[in-house]
Amino acid sequence: KVLLKSRPFEKEYSLYIGIPFCPTTCLYCSFTSFPVSRFGDRMRAYLDALYKELAFVAKHHRDKKLTTIYIGGGTPTALDEECLSKLMNMIHELFPVEESEEFTVESGRPDSITKEKFRILKEAGVTRISINPQTMHQETLDLIGRAHTVEQTKEAFLLARECGFDNINMDIITGLPG
């Protein structure tokens, strides 16, 4: 009760944006996601539809404070650089990003991360990223259909630091096969 009373929920909101694309579909995943190899040609159409929905949300929340933005998925960094940049521009056009307390992007899989994508996110004001290896055991990564290595995870983390990110989450799942 104390926590609920500490925030003026009637006057603020958080924004979640789902990006339903991934490099591949992982064995354990229950989220709606579409492999880029089969559905990548639909990214631009998805962003066009997403713009309409975000514009609707922005219009109906003008009188409230945007406290947090969270972009998840899927794997948002499965978007190519052009689409990722377009997404960031849409958000900035429609929402007062600079007023938010936190702006998180699930960078997700190390095999979808590039220096250019991190640059786009950093310039857009992203304050927190997630790099999600799910495990640091190569055998398990292979069994669950993750097309990246443990070494790529380490490299992605160091690249994030190099690009100026100091709030980095890393998801590890226990109980995976292997």
Walk through the language-model features, giving the residues of each.
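N-terminal [4Fe-4S]-dependent radical SAM core
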Residues: 1-15
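Short, flexible hinge/linker loops that cap or flank conserved catalytic cores
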Residues: 7-9, 20, 63, 97
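Structural motif
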Residues: 12-14, 26, 102
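Short linear sequence motifs
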Residues: 14, 21-24, 39, 150
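Short, well-ordered beta-strand segments
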Residues: 15-16, 72
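Local cysteine-cluster metal-coordination motifs and their immediate loop/turn environment
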Residues: 18-33
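Conserved non-cysteine loop/helix-boundary elements of the Radical SAM core domain that shape
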Residues: 33-178
